[in-house]
């Protein structure tokens, strides 16, 4: 309702004294409270915080400094409300969560500033978590429907363009692959992609392979690529793209599709590894999805003297797969994962870490418009990719939660337990990757890479480590 209309009476006969606006206060705890104002004319409701007007209410032009101050105040309040909602959700205080979500929806929008969009994404996920127990309601409203795979794949490709984290990671992986295998006499370089890599990464690898392998250009030098992916269109399109480039480069090329999701890869047999190949295994944002499934491994002597079954250890499917892959004795394994800790059992801590991580991603997406994509494409990435991940982290528990991101410190322990040792990236690989990051950032320091003491490469946005790239070999 327009502010100039406040206090005006309605025209026409009035049969009962109906107030134009109804107001009631709401206490969200933690010292946070405000007032809901409901209009009986147009049915709208907004939430007013002390000395901060609702985002839905019109504002008068102010000086830039005042506008920035108002935005910062509203941002602080949004974060406080989000945190209060998460605390209430963790305690099962549903009415408090409901009021908090009403407040967030009145203050934030999915097409505003990054913080507003972040609040909208997390409000969606918290609302889904609250109604998850009512499966009938979720199904009737279509809340459990996931984004179709082609749309998710398109959003992932657009994310790689707008936020070059994965392009940087793929380049570092390719340099490491070539360096680890170019001195080998094997006629076949077999690269197994467990999923997640962009076809552009393999185009670059083909070109590097053609220029750096012994007797480059001869057809007896073969690059064999195995890709695990469940989409026919992706597999066929990638095969045609790479076969055409290999023919242009006069490089022998073989393509081996494995039509499976990483969750369905129950053994290493479908990978089709052959003896005599220079084997390289690449996993891009895939292994964390296997941490949800745990099982007890039975000892070699499954029964003790009393006939009771002995449990040797409990491991995840990720650990079991890593152990099987180590048994193949690859020349190199490259692992790219989110440098985040979203696998905690405690909900509130997991939520707070996710809020910080995805806040940085949304800021990065915002900065990429319009240089590397449009606002429409940015919105598609947030809706089809980031929202799905946030929903998984915030709304799901148990085996249903697949986005179990872990920091490199934990992945290093898993790799060590599986039988891998670090294959430290050389300084020239780090330098070349750093140059690419500088170019993709338009000459700024928004994206940079850093090699830690253990040889792992971290990709930063400003001061935040966002993704890690680590290289491994077997003893």
Q: For each of these PLM feature ranges, what is it?
A:
Residues 1-475:
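Long, compositionally biased intrinsically disordered terminal regions
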